[in-house]
Swiss-Prot record:
It holds the Pfam family 7tm_1. Interacts with C6orf89. GO terms for biological process: adult feeding behavior; G protein-coupled receptor signaling pathway; glucose metabolic process; regulation of blood pressure. Its main location: membrane. This is Bombesin receptor subtype-3. Glycans are attached at N10, N18.
Length: 399
């Protein structure tokens, strides 16, 4: 059985933003087109490096996000408002890692699109849904952190968790609505390059001859899934920064230790969300820029240079890496998550959570009495724990 050869850079048509499914099949009378020749050949070493990188992204991402989700559902103290959104992010990342990333890895050995017309539509829908869940969840989470910083002492309503779950569900629904046109119009198209006597099969959302559609599609994806959400997030964090600067002029006194701790906790979570946003922006920017370059340049086919191929691989790997970095960013930023992550990773029993401080109060009582046989009066102090019966939001910010 003849070994399949990877496609050359000029035989891969990158047709949709954040593309994880595009693939091509080459039919040529020229035997030199069956492999990569000359300086553009990545060689078996480069091919192995690509597959090892994909394998690391998939395995590490699945492990990290699965543990994050397990920590959320098994640890009651972690079931808070910001953690609901972060867990929703983990589900979106898992969806991408289990479907689109393995499919993308088949490009380099497969001779054509392996998953048919239905697979093209389904995978296009999943890919854009996952990207939408990531960026829209970060937007909602930034808005939530802004409210928490501006009103740090405001109590959450009793149904706050339920309302947050509904918001997270709405993010998924909106993401699916935005991804629906991708599923409807995506198809496996065959393209021909008369200069090289070869044909291309690719899962795309438009025929390659429709240059205007490609330009509109790339621009809309860049705006809807990158520029607009990140602009909104930037506004929220500008307001957060201004609020935090003003708060330094009115720091609570030592007697208000609970208020101080709550404010500091919300500041810490705001910084954590900002790190997640920055990771998303950095990981997805090269992929968006590459798609815009393909859409608005006069070239019909991908630049055949080795440098272009390297940048294409780099942009894909960086975009997929965003789906596995969030759990490890949280591990680095949150001691609480770090503790539970280690416990789940090494199959140890997590430490029992401390009892809520806000539900009890320690009261010192003075007791006066007469000592028998002496007639002298002695006063003693005892500590009594009283249950207030009110639930103050004390563990809101765990990650």
């Amino acid at each position: 059985m003849a070994q399949r050869q990877p496609h050359s850079p000029n035989q891969t048509l990158i047709s949709i933003t954040n593309d994880t499914e595009s693939s091509s099949s080459v039919v040529s009378n020229d035997n030199t087109n069956k492999g990569w020749s000359g300086d553009n050949s990545p060689g078996i070493e480069a091919l192995c490096a690509i597959y090892i990188t994909y394998a690391v992204i998939i395995s590490v991402g699945i492990l990290g996000n699965a543990i994050l989700i397990k920590v959320f559902f098994k640890t009651k103290s972690m079931q808070t408002v910001p953690n609901i959104f972060i867990t929703s992010l983990a589900f979106g990342d898992l969806l991408l890692l289990l479907t689109c990333v393995p499919v993308d890895a088949t490009h380099y050995l497969a001779e054509g699109w392996l998953f048919g017309r239905i697979g093209c539509k389904v995978l296009s829908f999943i890919r854009l849904t996952s990207v939408g869940v990531s960026v829209f969840t970060l937007t909602i989470l930034s808005a939530d952190r802004y409210k928490a910083v501006v009103k740090p002492l405001e109590r959450q309503p009793s149904n706050a968790i339920l309302k947050t779950c509904v918001k997270a569900g709405c993010v998924w629904i909106v993401s699916m609505i935005f991804a629906l046109p991708e599923a409807i119009f995506s198809n496996v198209y065959t393209f021909r390059d008369p200069n090289k006597n070869m044909t291309f099969e690719s899962c795309t959302s438009y025929p390659v001859s429709k240059k205007l559609l490609q330009e509109i599609h790339s621009l809309l994806c860049f705006l809807v899934f990158y520029i607009i959400p990140l602009s909104i997030i930037s506004v929220y964090y500008s307001l957060i920064a201004r609020t935090l600067y003003k708060s330094t002029l009115n720091i609570p006194t030592e007697e208000q230790s609970h208020a101080r701790k709550q404010i500091e906790s919300r500041k810490r979570i705001a910084r954590t969300v900002l790190v997640l946003v920055a990771l998303f922006a950095l990981c997805w920017l090269p992929n968006h820029l590459l798609y815009l370059y393909h859409s608005f340049t006069s070239q019909t086919y991908v630049d055949p240079s080795a440098m272009h191929f390297i940048f294409t691989i780099f942009s894909r790997v960086l975009a997929f890496s965003n789906s596995c970095v969030n759990p490890f960013a949280l591990y680095w930023l949150s001691k609480s998550f770090q503790k539970h992550f280690k416990a789940q990773l090494f199959c140890c029993k997590a430490e029992r959570p401390e009892p809520p401080v806000a539900d009890t109060s320690l009261t010192t009582l003075a007791v006066m009495g007469t000592v028998p046989g002496t007639g002298s009066i002695q006063m003693s102090e005892i500590s009594v724990t009283s249950f207030t019966g009110c639930s103050v939001k004390q563990a809101e910010d765990r990650f």
